Amino acid sequence: ESEIATVLPRMLRRGKVAYLFNKYSRSQQIGCVLFCHHNDQKAEPTIGDTINSWIEDNIGKDAQERTRMLQDTRGISPLFLIATKFNIDLECTKNDKQDDTSTLDKHWNRFDTVLPEIVGPSKWLDQWTVSAGVAKPFQSIYPLRDFYWSAKNGLFDGYSDGETKSPEKGHFHPGFPGYMDCLRRSFLSNQFVRDHFASPEKTWEEVATLNNDGSKPIIRDLGEISGVLDEARRKRCLERLIALKKA
């Protein structure tokens, strides 16, 4: 009973969010979903099923349907997976050693473990679209870091969250002088990254370099898809109605 005061409001809030999401999804009023998750997120048990259902209803039940849909959205997925708090993934920890760079591989646990656990048994993460009979993995993942916490935790220096903003500066790690270069190589060699990022090098430049927090590609792709999404959704809806009529 002592936990009711904190647990009950959280349950009601989550129930309200789930209700509203399902309501607007069923009425086709959600064009894009930006699913934000941080590095060690303990997702609700049903979140994977919720995302999968939305994908099936709004993008396609299988790789072939999704391929047709994305042909009308300039190749941009209406589902954006936003890897928030990416500054935590990038931070140098006490376990990172210059003489054993293999420890850096643990920085990508979000991609290797957390995200696949959220998605669950659904196959769309690895079989998003198809080209020439070959399945292509989902590649609309956007790492996003926080400028303030990047400075606060020693990833970069110089940024101020006050009224006067200042540009970032490189941070020197005394115990690991080449830390960021080694971390970059670890990121680029990670198998999940190689599979699920169209250009890992570009992704790194857009989120893990000075004054780049990862927001630009999100804004860019939202701008690209916004002008064509309504027509693509109308076309998909019409195709589904025709299929139902023939059934």
Which residues does each PLM region occupy?
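Switch I (G2) and immediately adjacent beta-strands of P-loop GTPase domains
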Residues: 1-2
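Conserved GTPase G-domain substructure that encodes guanine base recognition and part of the catalytic core
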Residues: 6-33, 39-246
